[in-house]
């Protein structure tokens, strides 16, 4: 009997690995096909970003200064070399390798895009791996896991991030790695493997895009809170564990990413982020109307948030808030290729219903563990069964996890709103992509609550999950076939 059980277990593991491979391979095929079939400069600022990758390629690995004329945009007076450029370094590496076999000529930009293809493919892989731990089989059906993987991995806008030269794709990979580290902790504690994975994820995040830095901040608090509050040992031992493992996490993170910020500090007089130097460069080299001192922003125009939200530029299909929403789901090219509005509205409705339902899931945000004690008491001649809720003194790591996931949604939203109000009013949902995974987690949690309570037939419920998953996976394929190819 044990031999038979072992064989069945191994068969399930093989089937699971096959499913993961097929899922990730589908993403890779779509990303590669999309990247190879769309023309140059088909993503926001791709030309400016490609300048940096091309510079590194042509100068044999040398990194440009932010104000180098070879990478500086003549209109805006800045370059993306002020920001972390690891993504472009990987693109340059692919470009260099391609020259060993042939000269791609004008199509070299397609080779550069392969870095982004692999970043988002890697993100899909870690999302799938995380889904199994976020929605364990002891509590959820396997279809719930795949619904989350489809929502987070095959969001049309997230797929689009992997088809042109940019750093958002690396940010998605970093977020997926960190999410997997968090999810692994929930099932396995802070093992050395999970600590190192967290450190690598944070380092990659630091070298990706600034709007994803919420993942680093929340990782710090999540690690500290779960160690100090949730470990079952003396407080002194928890503190010792915090500093011993925390020191290793910090060291690995700094070793992997610290060089970039040291370089910035040396080049730009202590400006380790490069943002102040970038603004000064824009003031010096930008065309007159595009200099930060005179460029019209909502703050300078005296707009309030109602003015911003309802504003509709003559070239936009929707007002500001709707443009942000639909471009978070999927808007392509230079933000001018829209998905059918009906499809976008269906996505938004699906998200909204799922999020609202989360608030009806018991104990989702409880920071203390709770248990229910059933007692029988005599009332006259009757015996009543009374259910009492008892709040434990123990901290609930799931509740802490959910709280951090809320912050992961809020942080990029606040950063985006600050950028819109004080720097540049661009209603682009791609700036909110760091919130994708926590948002889709709550959407999945909400829909699991809805379907569990309303659809009692397990086979019917399973069918609904599968249909939704297939539709979500097909969606970006349809976007490529009907919107990009024509």
Predicted ranges, named:
Residues 110-138, 177, 181:
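Transmembrane-helix motifs of polytopic, lipid-linked glycan transferases
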Residues 157-170:
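Short acidic/glycine- and proline-prone juxtamembrane loop motifs at membrane-interface regions
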Residues 1-33, 227-228, 236-252, 362, ...:
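Start-transfer (signal-anchor) and selected internal transmembrane alpha helices
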Residues 225, 244-358, 483:
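Membrane-lumen/periplasm interface segments of specific transmembrane helices
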Residues 106-120, 310-409, 436:
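Membrane-interface anchor segments at the N-terminal boundary of transmembrane helices
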Residues 18-21, 103-106, 127-154:
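Transmembrane-helix signature of polytopic, membrane-embedded enzymes
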Residues 132-139, 178-197, 205, 227-233:
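Membrane-interface transmembrane helices that cradle and orient dolichyl/undecaprenyl
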Residues 15-47, 54-65, 75, 248-266, ...:
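Transmembrane signal-anchor helices characteristic of membrane glycosylation enzymes that use polyprenol
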